[in-house]
Amino acid sequence: MGTLQSWRRAYGALKDTTKVGLVRVNSDYAELDVAIVKATNHVECPPKDRHLRKIFLATSAIRPRADVAYCIHALSRRLHKTRNWTVALKALLVIHRLLRDGDPTFREELLNFSQKGRIMQISNFKDDSSPVAWDCSGWVRTYALFLEERLECFRVLKYDIEAERLPKVSPGQEKGYSKTRDLDGEKLLEQLPALQQLLHRLIGCKPEGAAKHNHIIQYALSLVLKESFKVYCAINEGIINLVEKFFEMPRHEAIKALEIYKRAGLQAGNLSAFYEVCKGLELARNFQFPVLREPPQSFLTTMEEYMRDAPQMVDVTSGPLLLTYTPDDGLTSEDVGPSHEEHETSSPSDSAVVPSEETQLSSQSPPSVETPQNFIDTDDLLGLHDDTPDPLAILDQNALALALVSNDVDSSPFSFGQARDLDPSGWELALVTTPSNDISAATERQLAGGLDTLTLNSLYDDGALRAAQQPAYGVPASNPFEVQDLFAFSDSVSPPSAVNNPFGLYEPTYHQQEQQPQLQVAPSPANPFGDFGEFPIVPVSEPQSTTSFGAFPVPVSEPSNTTGFGEIPVVPVTEPPNTTAFGEFPVVPVSEPQNITGFGALPVTPASEPSNTTGFGEFPVVSVSAPQNTTGFGALPVIPVSEPSKTTGLGEFPVVPVSEPQNTTGFGEFPVNAGAHEQHNSNNPFGSTGFL
């Protein structure tokens, strides 16, 4: 067992040394962190004063509040991360010493920090390293609850019990008294429960088991005993003050005072038992324990008898009470006031509250005053001086309840209240018209049942609105997700292009011509490299094409196209001409579309198998039964019988299809006769081999 304890002490010392080295390197408050680690090390002894003085200096009023807050945060982190009861108890001891002997700035910052979370809430703390540690862990938890309640008591009392200096009652009396002796009844009922709860936590710090004989626990218990004397003194002085004010309190306050008095008697007995336990410890040599006496039972019985006869709480207003005077009733100023039935049957003018001087003047006036027939009081248009009318009277006089209105209209004179109920537009008309005492015009406008023209028109308008809002049968329901057109208010005005086409702003300046099922003549797009001239398209029945070598008529049924280099007839069948960025090169696709490259227009017309070209030039190959092949030394075109003529970008080479087609090149004409077996001709690059 001794070896295990020695190993644990060595391990704790190693952890403390490592922690000190780490905080010296990594912490911005190295000196404060080192003092906190050394004051809360694993050694079972009270914190040393030299380490406490450094912590007191860091939390003094001359230091910034940020340093005080960092100290509280470091102590809280040290308390909640440890699993050793010695480190936890020494951290609580440092906090207790700062609350007792430290600057008030620390208490204020600790209150602000406790609002975010309880710093000393360690109800789950437990050290299972040994049976002694088990008992000590229980006392550490009760000690933390006492410190937490001490902080809460400071929040209620607004002052610290331990820091309170007890004044002398008189020069010849040595015993002082607490602030609770001079409190009024309301504050006394607020502060005494907080002090009694603090005393309850203090009595709970009674050590048990192995914790009674631990040296560091007895050191912390001595601090608790010192505070118990002042806490009990404050409660005792408050009870004396409470007893003096008890017989002057109303019933609800007397009930609270009686509960406080009963709890004080019970706590006196518990505190005496706590002192008896402490007297058996070594620390009892430094303390002189007071003798506590419980309150007499006879006085408690007297207080309970007073509670049965105590008056109820009555709220009496300080202002003068105004009574309503009615001439018909023989009430005097000593009566309480008119009954509820008389209050309901009285007229609005009689129920108005008037001062006492006007009451005396009204007693001398006649008991009733005749109200003119056509008189309306315009001073009270909203009826603020009138009481709430009877619902049955409103139902009988309601002009909108047509089913309840009789046909017989009473033409007798009516008072102002009746005119107001029958005319639903009373105060609205009075706001827009000149005040007048004559209501004959309004009476003439009224119809049967008390209705007037304005009310009747409003009923018709309301009926038309309800009919318009009713759903029509057979009409498809509207789509709730359909977005309404912003320009639907006018069909004659077309909306701007930005609404119809939101992408119109981002379209390029040139547009590609769409393919049409019929032959169309479209304007040529602009050439970015310059315009070589106009290229008219003239449809003829049999156009003739010419070159620099001669005229070569080509009978076609479609119009010919020309370019800036010469006339190159191209017969479009179904597809429009295509252009590139280097110029206009019309290509007429027969069954397959033409392909173009970046070096120029190389039209390829597939018959059964399309022609092939190379990078040295254009070599169209037209296959009849077996297609012709060309070489890189010259173009050997073979034109089938039923196929149109082909052109290139180097010049115009018309080919006239006959029963036996002829082939030409740029150096001359080379006729080729096609029979059962097709002949292949080749050109001599140094001259022509035959002429027609």
Swiss-Prot record:
Domain ENTH per the UniProt entry, residue ranges: 24-161
Matching InterPro entries: ANTH_dom, ANTH_dom_sf, ANTH_N_plant, AP180-like, ENTH, ENTH_VHS
Subcellular location(s) per record: Membrane, Clathrin-coated pit; Golgi apparatus; Cytoplasmic vesicle, Clathrin-coated vesicle
Sequence repeat start and end residues: 532-548, 549-564, 565-581, 582-598, 599-615, 616-632, 633-649, 650-666
Tissue expression notes: Expressed in the whole plant.
Superkingdom field: Eukaryota
GO terms (BP aspect): clathrin coat assembly; clathrin-dependent endocytosis
This protein's GO CC annotations: clathrin-coated pit; clathrin-coated vesicle; extracellular region; Golgi apparatus
GO molecular function, one term: 1-phosphatidylinositol binding
Polar residues composition-biased segments: 357-376
List of residues that carry Phosphoserine: 363
Region of interest called Disordered, as start-end residue ranges on this chain: 325-383
Record key words, sorted: Coated pit, Cytoplasmic vesicle, Endocytosis, Golgi apparatus, Membrane, Phosphoprotein, Repeat
Region: 8 X 17 AA approximate tandem repeats, residue numbers: 532-666
Major subcellular site: membrane
Keyword field contains Membrane: yes
Protein name stated in the entry: Putative clathrin assembly protein At1g14910
UniProt source species: Arabidopsis thaliana (Mouse-ear cress)
Lineage, uppermost ranks: Eukaryota, Viridiplantae, Streptophyta, Embryophyta, Tracheophyta
